[in-house]
C-alpha cells in the first residue's frame, strides 16, 4: 500500500460530477470538504463530460460538440497511431487543457496547500472502453490493439494529473471512476473479468501515487478488494450491507486499504428521509459488523473517508439537494470525529466509545 501522507480519520471528500452551471459556485462547494476535488460540470459544457475529457488527443476520436457525441473510427485510429506514438513521451499529450476543462484549471489557480490532501479523478479505461464504440457499434475495448493503447493512454493521463495536483498539495491523489465495471461480470460481455483483472492490475501498477477506484455500481467486490488498489470509494448507503460480508474487505483494511464510505444520499426524496443520527447509525452498523468479524475498529476509523453516496444530475432542484448533501456530510463527519476523538494526533476511540 502507498502512504497517503495524511490520516483519513473520517474526513470528507466527494466524487467529481456535480449538477452546477456556475463554475465558481461549484468550486466553492467542493472546497468546503476536508479533501476538495475539481468538479466535472457536464451542464456547463460537453467538454466537461468525463468521457470527453479522457479522450483528448486519443487517436481515432472525434468530438461532436454540437450533437454531443463521441465518434471513434478504427481506420482513423490506425492512421493517427504513428503520430500519437511520436508524441507519447511529451507530457502535453496527456495534459487536460483549458478547452477540455476550464474547471480543472480554475481549481489549480486556488491556494490548496492548507488542505490535508486534494483529489482528482479520471474515467477508468475499462468503463471508457466499454462505453465508446467504433463505427460498427462495437465497444473499442474489444479491439486488442485499441485496448492496449487505451490503457496506457489513461494511465499516462492519470499520472500527468497527479503530478500537476501534487504541485498544489503534496498529499494529492487521483482515483479512477469505474461506473461500467459491473458489465464485465455479465455473460453477455465480450470482455470478461479474467482479462479485466489482468489489464486492471497492469494499469494500477503503472500509476504514480495512491491508487484509488470509485464506483456506484455493484461489481464482484472481491475483484476490486483483491486488486492492487489503495483506496476504494463506493456507495455504502445502498451497497454497504453487502460489502461488509466479504472477507476480502477485512483483508483490504488490514493491509492498509482506505475506504471512502459514500453514505449521504444526493437524491432529494432519499435525503429528506435521513438525519445526521440515522446516517451515523447506518455507518456504525456497518462498522460494528466488521468489528465482530475481526476488523480492528480503531484502524477502520483511521482508514475511513466519508463522501456523498452518488453523484446526481437528475434532481428537479438542480444543485440544491447536492449542496445540502455536502452540508450534511460535513456535519456527519464532525459528529463522528467528535465521538471517536478523530484528530490528527489522537488515537480514535473504539466502537463502544472506549479509548
Set out the residue ranges of the language-model regions:
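Active-site loop segments of alpha/beta catalytic cores
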Residues: 117-120, 139, 143-247
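Structural preference for beta-strand elements that scaffold enzyme active sites
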Residues: 12, 35-39, 117-121, 171-175, ...
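Active-site-proximal beta-alpha loop/turn segments in soluble metabolic enzymes
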Residues: 131-146, 175-191, 263-273, 307-317
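Glycine-rich anion/phosphate-binding loops
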Residues: 91-108, 144-160, 278-287
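Non-catalytic scaffold segments within catalytic domains of secreted glycoside hydrolases
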Residues: 58-81, 193-218, 232, 246-250, ...
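Alpha/beta catalytic barrel-like cores
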Residues: 1-142, 257, 289-293, 302, ...
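Catalytic-face loop-and-helix region of soluble metabolic enzyme cores
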Residues: 230-342
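Short, basic, low-complexity termini and linkers enriched in Ser/Thr/Gly/Pro
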Residues: 343-355
Amino acid at each position: 500500500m502507498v502512504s497517503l501522507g495524511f490520516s483519513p480519520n473520517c474526513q470528507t471528500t466527494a466524487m467529481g460530477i456535480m449538477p452546477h452551471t456556475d463554475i465558481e459556485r461549484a468550486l466553492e462547494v467542493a472546497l468546503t470538504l476536508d479533501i476538495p476535488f475539481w468538479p466535472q460540470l457536464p451542464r456547463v459544457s460537453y467538454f466537461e463530460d468525463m468521457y470527453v475529457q479522457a479522450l483528448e488527443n486519443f487517436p481515432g476520436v472525434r468530438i461532436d460538440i454540437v450533437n454531443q457525441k463521441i465518434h471513434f473510427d478504427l481506420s482513423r485510429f490506425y492512421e493517427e497511431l504513428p503520430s500519437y506514438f511520436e508524441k507519447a513521451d511529451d507530457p502535453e499529450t496527456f495534459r487536460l487543457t483549458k478547452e477540455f476543462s476550464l474547471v480543472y484549471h480554475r481549481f489549480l489557480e486556488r491556494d490548496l496547500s492548507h488542505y490535508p490532501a486534494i483529489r482528482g479523478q479520471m474515467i477508468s479505461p475499462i468503463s471508457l472502453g466499454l462505453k465508446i464504440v467504433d463505427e460498427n457499434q462495437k465497444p473499442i475495448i474489444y479491439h486488442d490493439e485499441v485496448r492496449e493503447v487505451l490503457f496506457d493512454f489513461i494511465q499516462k493521463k492519470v499520472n500527468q494529473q497527479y503530478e500537476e495536483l501534487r504541485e498544489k498539495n503534496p498529499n494529492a491523489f487521483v482515483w479512477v471512476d469505474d461506473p461500467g465495471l459491473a458489465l464485465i461480470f455479465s455473460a453477455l460481455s465480450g470482455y470478461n473479468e479474467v482479462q479485466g483483472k489482468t489489464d486492471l492490475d497492469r494499469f494500477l501498477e503503472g500509476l504514480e501515487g495512491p491508487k484509488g477506484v470509485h464506483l456506484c455500481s455493484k461489481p464482484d467486490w472481491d475483484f476490486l478488494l483483491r486488486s492492487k488498489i489503495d483506496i476504494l470509494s463506493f456507495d455504502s448507503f445502498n451497497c454497504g450491507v453487502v460489502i461488509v460480508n466479504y472477507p476480502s474487505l477485512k483483508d483490504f483494511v488490514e493491509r492498509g486499504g482506505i475506504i471512502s464510505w459514500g453514505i449521504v444520499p444526493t437524491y432529494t426524496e432519499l435525503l429528506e428521509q435521513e438525519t445526521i443520527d440515522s446516517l451515523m447509525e447506518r455507518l456504525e452498523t456497518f462498522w460494528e459488523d466488521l468489528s465482530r468479524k475481526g476488523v480492528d475498529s480503531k484502524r477502520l476509523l483511521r482508514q475511513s473517508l466519508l463522501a456523498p453516496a452518488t453523484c446526481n444530475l437528475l434532481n428537479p432542484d438542480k444543485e440544491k439537494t447536492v449542496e445540502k448533501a455536502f452540508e450534511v456530510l460535513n456535519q456527519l463527519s464532525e459528529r463522528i470525529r467528535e465521538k471517536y476523538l478523530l484528530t490528527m494526533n489522537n488515537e480514535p476511540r473504539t466502537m463502544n466509545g472506549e479509548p
